[in-house]
């Protein structure tokens, strides 16, 4: 048995993987380069710092993100438990106070006696020495990226991701906005900034004319479609934003009794409710232009920005050529990958792959062969995608029903209602997941 386990990266995936190993009685070395060396996007030395949104997506029952979180919960996810404890109001979504979340993850991980935290940059990987989980995330350092390229035999793939601005709550003119949840589902947790056509056109023109941050390396940018900067969306057509992040449907303005022409939504950032982020407003405009354009939004005329939108490069491996369905390298079986560097996109997906990698590496450490989760589960569908997608055009993916197996033809003919179909898919997935957990993860 090889009981020596190293986990590189104390982000979402790395912390979850370390916890899964520790709860199975295994000793872990967890490496984190911050604060010795930071990244362009991180602001603290805390583990599991959320650098983009503070949302862990839908908590609505029988949605694909809900299914993935339910499997994680049944599998004993630490970070999901902490997310629930540090949640902030966000309608049908699970959003967290990002500071409280990262602080609590750090506290719990550092207090676990089986986890030894090592602060400093890892630049070399000995694939024959120890069982290793690489969970360094999309902002992996250059030196370690070169080492991963050596292991993988090829260069990394990448896309560009961007971050939304955050404003002080006290700087929002509440007389010009209203609280609501879309279609009045759940509690009215979002601040909604309504626009008429004239206001929208003025905002759009200013957005298109604004200047982006200059950087030679950002020529011919390759964006992740699920997180496009708003200026890129705007260039695709004058109404594109109104059918995207500024979609007004389901958000009745109490002053008019109608849907606005367009809406900007603000989501609470922390438990103190002293700051809000602009939902879906990731961008990489110059700060001066960004402030000028965002202050054209009704209610934000005097907004004070705690953080401006920005862009950063996200690195990931070509998983279909490199990994098995247990997140293990085909050519180097002592090495596992987890998190966004493995080719998933999203906080929850990163935690889930960390959870799986922790389970699998623990099984190997105890002298057994790991068993991949069933294809019918959200876990299984996620790893099926990253391991079997077309390698030539591989891009990171979120969990969606498109990744999960569809009902058979007879069931589809019998059940026409989309919500009922989704419920049936979730029910089947959880049944398969429970069976897999009971029979294959024997070292819980």
UniProtKB/Swiss-Prot annotation:
An individual GO BP term: tRNA methylation
Principal subcellular localisation of the protein: cytoplasm
Coiled-coil segments: none
Gene3D superfamilies, alphabetized: FAD/NAD(P)-binding domain (3.50.50.60)
GO cellular component, one term: cytosol
Keywords carried by this UniProt record: Cytoplasm, FAD, Flavoprotein, Methyltransferase, NAD, NADP, Transferase, tRNA processing
Gene Ontology molecular function: flavin adenine dinucleotide binding; tRNA (uracil(54)-C5)-methyltransferase activity, 5,10-methylenetetrahydrofolate-dependent
Reaction equation(s) it catalyzes: uridine(54) in tRNA + (6R)-5,10-methylene-5,6,7,8-tetrahydrofolate + NADH + H(+) = 5-methyluridine(54) in tRNA + (6S)-5,6,7,8-tetrahydrofolate + NAD(+); uridine(54) in tRNA + (6R)-5,10-methylene-5,6,7,8-tetrahydrofolate + NADPH + H(+) = 5-methyluridine(54) in tRNA + (6S)-5,6,7,8-tetrahydrofolate + NADP(+)
InterPro entries with a match to the protein in the record: FAD/NAD-bd_sf (IPR036188), MnmG-rel (IPR002218), MnmG_N (IPR040131), TrmFO (IPR004417)
Signal sequence region: none
Subcellular location: Cytoplasm
Entry binding sites for FAD: 9-14
PANTHER family: GLUCOSE INHIBITED DIVISION PROTEIN A, METHYLENETETRAHYDROFOLATE--TRNA-(URACIL-5-)-METHYLTRANSFERASE TRMFO
Function, in words: Catalyzes the folate-dependent formation of 5-methyl-uridine at position 54 (M-5-U54) in all tRNAs.
NCBIfam families referenced in this protein's UniProt entry, alphabetically: gid_trmFO (TIGR00137), PRK05335.1 (NF003739)
Family: Belongs to the MnmG family. TrmFO subfamily.
Entries under HAMAP family matching the protein: TrmFO
Name of the protein in its database record: Methylenetetrahydrofolate--tRNA-(uracil-5-)-methyltransferase TrmFO
Species in which this protein is naturally found: Koribacter versatilis (strain Ellin345)
Lineage: Bacteria, Pseudomonadati, Acidobacteriota, Terriglobia, Terriglobales
Gene: trmFO
């Amino acid at each position: 048995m090889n009981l020596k386990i190293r986990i590189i990266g104390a982000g979402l995936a790395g912390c979850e993987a370390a916890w899964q190993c520790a709860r199975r009685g295994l000793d872990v070395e967890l490496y984190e380069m911050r604060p010795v060396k930071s990244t362009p996007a991180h602001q603290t030395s805390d583990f599991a710092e959320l650098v983009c949104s503070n949302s862990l997506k839908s908590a609505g029952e029988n949605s694909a993100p809900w299914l993935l979180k339910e499997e994680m919960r049944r599998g004993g996810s630490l970070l999901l438990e902490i997310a629930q404890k540090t949640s902030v109001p966000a309608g049908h979504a699970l959003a967290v106070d990002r500071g409280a979340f990262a602080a609590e993850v750090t506290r719990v991980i550092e207090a676990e006696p089986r986890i030894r935290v090592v602060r400093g940059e890892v630049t070399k990987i000995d694939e024959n020495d120890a069982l290793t989980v690489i969970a360094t995330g999309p902002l992996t350092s250059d030196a370690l990226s070169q080492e991963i390229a050596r292991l993988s035999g090829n260069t990394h793939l990448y896309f560009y991701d961007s971050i939304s601005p955050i404003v002080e709550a006290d700087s929002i003119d509440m007389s010009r906005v209203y609280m609501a949840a879309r279609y009045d589902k759940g509690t009215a947790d979002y601040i909604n900034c309504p626009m008429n056509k004239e206001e929208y056109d003025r905002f759009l023109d200013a957005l298109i004319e604004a200047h982006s941050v200059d950087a030679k390396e950002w020529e011919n940018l390759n964006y992740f479609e699920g997180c496009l900067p708003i200026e890129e969306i705007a260039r695709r057509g004058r109404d594109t934003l109104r059918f995207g992040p500024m979609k007004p449907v389901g958000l009745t303005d109490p002053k008019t009794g109608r849907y606005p022409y367009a809406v900007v939504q603000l989501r609470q950032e922390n438990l103190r409710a002293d700051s809000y982020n602009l939902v879906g407003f990731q961008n990489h405009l110059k700060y001066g232009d960004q402030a000028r354009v965002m202050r054209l939004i009704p209610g934000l005329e005097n907004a004070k920005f705690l953080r401006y939108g920005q862009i950063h490069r996200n690195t990931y491996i070509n998983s279909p050529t490199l990994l098995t369905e247990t997140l293990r390298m085909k050519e180097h079986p002592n090495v596992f990958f987890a998190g966004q560097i493995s080719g998933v996109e999203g906080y929850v997906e990163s935690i889930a792959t960390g959870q799986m990698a922790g389970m699998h590496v623990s099984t190997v450490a105890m002298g057994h062969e790991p068993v991949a989760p069933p294809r019918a589960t959200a876990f299984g569908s996620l790893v099926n995608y990253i391991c079997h997608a077309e390698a030539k055009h591989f891009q990171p993916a979120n969990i969606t029903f498109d990744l999960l197996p569809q009902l058979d033809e007879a069931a589809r003919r019998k059940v026409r209602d989309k919500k009922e179909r989704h419920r049936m898919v979730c029910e089947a997935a959880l049944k398969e997941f429970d069976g897999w957990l009971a029979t294959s993860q024997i070292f819980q």
